[in-house]
From Swiss-Prot:
This is ATP synthase subunit beta, chloroplastic. HAMAP family: ATP_synth_beta_bact (MF_01347). ATP binds at residues 172-179. Its EC number is 7.1.2.2. Keywords: ATP synthesis, ATP-binding, CF(1), Chloroplast, Hydrogen ion transport, Ion transport, Membrane, Nucleotide-binding, Phosphoprotein, Plastid, Thylakoid, Translocase, Transport. Produces ATP from ADP in the presence of a proton gradient across the membrane. The catalytic sites are hosted primarily by the beta subunits.
């Protein structure tokens, strides 16, 4: 641990102590820097360019060494805009990789990729920093216990339960509710588990980052009056930032989460929104560095970069990092190399469906496409497993019958199939749920549903106990008791209309 050279003003003594180079070439966010013979920086070292532009404005650009070119030159990628830089400017080799603040002082704050606070709340009250590049925990340090992480979201807990200390992927195209689901998870986990979260906004919209921050302040996840009581640290590298920043912001968030796990011995939640943008930024940097592209134009090092990040997200004997990663699926194609590479690292996948979103069923989690390695009788128990399998079988049969219904109509089905369809439609609606973070849009108060309540509700629907209730009663409710109360209200309303 050391004082952060990239976020504090380097004094003259540091400047003299460190190696000094000069900019030889600038191509967009990529800089070639010449150093004196024998004074070459290491790969991943931080370089700082300081000076003034033609208007006299101060320049302070941090870069990261990516390649050693020979002839005493290195190629570095800038972490911020390179406007105003010119050839011949001094470049200081800081002698270490980028280091960022870590610990309790980061809670309730917003940081950029360099660990600099960007929320106008003054400097971070800590001198403890940690480098963003480090090795994954040794095999002997890993913890392999299997336990469920309850989220309070019915469709997730029943059909694709999350593993404590596991990696979960949220797959979906644009506008189907990935970020809303992440916000709900942060809210539920902070309130139900009292856990600390780190949110890495990787290459997403600045407006969404701002909305998320405001939502967190309103819901109490961030306590403005006493930041130490906040439950989340935010790290943003948004769409408008250079590819270097977007490529490294995930590592900055992960470094903060690792400190809570390893030093504070806490269970941490790491949210990455969006892991596809991490791959996309890596692809841009790869092209800028002149590497030959691989399949579909992605970088040839795609698997290595993904593996380096994902292997650090793990549980050790000290604590756990449970990671929830939103994965944008280009053109809804799950075979695209970016989502396909991500799949290999995940314990559970929550796939969001445009079809369900179009029906107005939120969260639009596809119950048949979503999977989890935890859905085994020896882990979740026989009752949970059997209920989940029956729900899936009912929905699968309904899916198979939809073509027949579209052509011949519901009346042409057998009595048994008609009953299956009726129950499947109730199940489909009961899988929807009002979110706390969506209260302002829906007008319905959010609901947290425990796992036992969820299993009880679906068992009752499958048993046929509620065959007489209208399917509308099961839409956007919490537990099954709310559905029966809603059915009674609907019945009274229809009588009044008559």
């Amino acid at each position: 641990m050391r004082t952060n050279p990239t976020t504090s003003d380097p004094a003259v003594s540091i400047r003299e102590k460190n190696n000094l180079g000069r900019i030889a070439q600038i191509i967009g966010p990529v800089l070639d820097v010449a150093f004196p013979p024998g004074k070459m920086p290491n790969i991943y070292n931080a370089l700082v360019v300081k000076g003034r532009d033609t208007l006299g404005q101060e320049i302070n650009v941090t870069c990261e060494v990516q390649q050693l070119l020979g002839n005493n030159r290195v190629r570095a990628v800038a972490m911020s805009a390179t406007e105003g830089l010119k050839r011949g400017m001094d470049v200081v080799d800081m002698g270490n990789p980028l280091s960022v603040p870590v610990g309790g002082a980061t809670l309730g704050r917003i940081f950029n990729v360099l660990g600099e606070p960007v929320d106008n709340l003054g400097p971070v009250d800590t001198s403890t920093t940690s480098p963003i590049h480090k090795s994954a925990p040794a095999f002997i340090q890993l913890d392999t216990k299997l336990s469920i992480f309850e989220t309070g979201i019915k469709v997730v807990d029943l059909l694709a339960p999350y593993r404590r200390g596991g990696k979960i992927g949220l797959f979906g195209g644009a506008g189907v509710g990935k970020t809303s689901l992440i916000m709900e998870l942060i809210n539920n986990i902070a309130k139900a588990h009292g856990g600390v979260s780190v949110f890495g906004g990787v290459g997403e919209r600045t407006r969404e980052g701002n909305d998320l921050y405001k939502e967190m302040k309103e819901s109490g996840v961030i306590n403005e009056l006493n930041l130490a009581e906040s439950k989340v640290a935010l790290v943003y590298g948004q769409m408008n930032e250079p590819p270097g920043a977007r490529m490294r912001v995930g590592l900055t968030a992960l470094t903060m989460a690792e400190y809570f796990r390893d030093v504070n011995k806490q269970d941490v939640l790491l949210f990455i929104d969006n892991i596809f943008r991490f791959v996309q930024a890596g692809s841009e940097v790869s092209a800028l560095l002149g590497r030959m592209p691989s399949a579909v134009g992605y970088q040839p090092t795609l698997s290595t970069e993904m593996g380096t990040l994902q292997e650090r997200i793990t549980s050790t004997k000290k604590g756990s990092i449970t990671s929830i990663q939103a994965v944008y699926v280009p053109a809804d194609d799950l075979t695209d190399p970016a989502p396909a590479t991500t799949f290999a690292h995940l314990d559970a996948t929550t796939v969001l469906s445009r079809g369900l979103a179009a029906k107005g069923i939120y969260p639009a989690v596809d119950p048949l496409d979503s999977t989890s390695t935890m859905l085994q009788p020896r882990i979740v128990g026989e009752e949970h497993y059997e209920t989940a399998q029956q729900v899936k079988q009912t929905l699968q049969r309904y899916k198979e019958l939809q073509d027949i219904i579209a052509i011949l109509g519901l009346d042409e089905l057998s009595e048994e199939d008609r009953l299956t369809v009726a129950r499947a439609r109730k199940i489909e609606r009961f899988l929807s749920q009002p979110f706390f973070v969506a209260e302002v849009f829906t007008g319905s108060p959010g609901k947290y549903v425990g796992l036992a309540e969820t299993i009880r509700g679906f068992k009752l629907i499958l048993s046929g106990e509620f065959d007489s209730l209208p399917e509308q009663a099961f839409y956007l409710v919490g537990n099954i008791d709310e559905a029966t109360a809603k059915a009674t209200n609907l019945e009274m309303e229809s009588k009044l209309k008559k």
